[in-house]
UniProtKB/Swiss-Prot annotation:
Entry superkingdom: Bacteria
UniProt entry keywords in alphabetical sequence: Methyltransferase, S-adenosyl-L-methionine, Transferase, tRNA processing
Binding site for substrate: 141, 173, 211-214
An annotated GO cellular component: tRNA methyltransferase complex
Annotated organism of origin: Rhizobium meliloti (strain 1021) (Ensifer meliloti)
Protein's recorded name: tRNA (guanine-N(7)-)-methyltransferase
Biological role: Catalyzes the formation of N(7)-methylguanine at position 46 (m7G46) in tRNA.
InterPro entries: SAM-dependent_MTases_sf (IPR029063), tRNA_(Gua-N-7)_MeTrfase_Trmb (IPR003358), tRNA_methyltr_TrmB_bact (IPR055361)
Length: 232
């Protein structure tokens, strides 16, 4: 499948940027805490991404579109030896996560609050151990499918920054997006689907915390799929 990379101005995969008004403390977190944790893409990325973190880390994990932040906070708290980079353009979600980072004194998270493709293009080659794309916007209407984050162009980006043997993990409750991701990844030479049996993609990833998106899917009668692809 051949796709032409769009101009940066059109390369947006998210909808609204802000929802309900922020509380005073949330606004303060955005003003004072986010600048301390935000990646500076005006500067070259360090060759070794562990240098981005104040404490020693051994691995780097990128989560694109962390939403409510439940998964990112859970993973960062349970695995201090991993440095996490979280990307989320939605202001309210970022403000919520910053509050959790402060409350739990998390020190192994760095953040970016705009288009994830900017981060993907900034990161060095073969620098990331795992990429998580969990319950992304499915853009259900066919005319909007080109906005889905999973594309051959973005898989090229993933392939560039993942270390050999690194993982791309995807979760969704939308059948059309699950199939879309399987097709795109199986058409991409750099990725191998790790599943050997149905249980492998019907069972949540190891250490998986339940998220509000997953709970909403269950309430509405939808099951989720958990797909893992290894960088060849």
């Amino acid at each position: 499948m051949t796709e032409t990379r769009g101009a940066r101005a059109t390369e947006a995969f998210f909808g609204r940027r802000k929802g309900k008004p922020l509380r005073e403390r949330q606004a303060a977190h955005l003003e004072h805490l986010l600048p301390l944790l935000k990646l500076d893409l005006e500067e070259p990325a360090p060759a070794d991404l562990t240098a981005l973190f104040p404490e020693p880390v051994e691995r780097i994990r990128l989560e694109i579109g962390f939403g409510g932040g439940e998964h990112l906070i859970h993973r960062a708290a349970e695995d201090p030896a991993t440095g996490f980079i979280g990307v989320e353009p939605f202001v309210n979600s970022m403000a919520k996560l910053l509050g959790q980072i402060e409350a739990k004194a998390i020190r192994n998270i760095r953040l970016y609050d705009d288009d994830a493709t900017q981060v993907l293009d900034w990161l060095p080659a073969a620098s990331v151990d795992q990429i998580d794309l969990l319950y992304p916007d499915p853009w259900p209407k066919r005319k909007h499918w080109k906005r889905r984050f999973v594309s051959q162009i973005n898989l090229d980006r993933f392939a560039r920054i993942l270390k050999p043997g690194g993982l791309f993990c995807f979760a969704s409750d939308i059948d059309s997006y699950i199939n879309w991701t399987l097709i795109h990844c199986r058409e991409h030479a750099a990725f191998e689907w790790t599943a050997e049996r149905a249980a492998d993609w019907l069972t949540p990833f190891a250490g998986w915390p339940s998220t509000r998106y997953e709970a909403k899917a269950r309430r509405e009668g939808r099951s989720s799929a958990y797909l893992a692809f290894r960088r060849a």
